[in-house]
Amino acid sequence: MFQLVVDDEIVLVLAEERHAQLMTELIKRNQSRLARWEPWAEQPATISSTRAYIRAALEDFLRGCQISTIIALDGGGRFIGRCGLRINPHAGSGDIGYWIDAEYEGRGITRRAAHALVTAAFSELDLKRVDLRTSVENKRSRGLAERLGFSFKGTHARGLRFANRTDDLALYTVTAQEWTAKQP
């Protein structure tokens, strides 16, 4: 299946059902932190819910609508987060999302993983645009979007719906042409 070697430390591995146990443990370790930014993380992680997510993501992968990867170290042996791309093949665009275990935050791993996936979106999938959507309050994610070269396009009032609240959504975008021009 799909695997993307980012560098000598990081590999993005397509999430498969055999990864459900490890993914569930990783989500549980980070649940309270993730639930602040991700509506899906408000529900307790279970192996069955993780398996269901992986099955749906694999079906979407086969249809060309999603690439859901695990950020892994040690040649794929240690799972530390997730980086994915939802694809709209008709529009030629994608939506990137990511999260990482708190223990690995601040080391540039998420930036490198996201950079590799956006590069693949343009060079391998021939997408024309990649969007990044996050809470306006999520300063780390917004900072990452800007470091990657995405442009802030505006906010969607109450665009992120949680069980007991809504957050305004910040939208960032980069086109294939902009991405190529910004690469060394």
What are these regions (language model features)?
Residues 45-46, 61, 164, 179:
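A short hydrophobic/aromatic micro-motif that marks alpha-helical segments and, especially, helix-coil
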Residues 52-56, 116-119:
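Generic recognition of well-ordered alpha-helical segments
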Residues 59-64, 150:
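Short loop/turn motifs at secondary-structure junctions and domain boundaries
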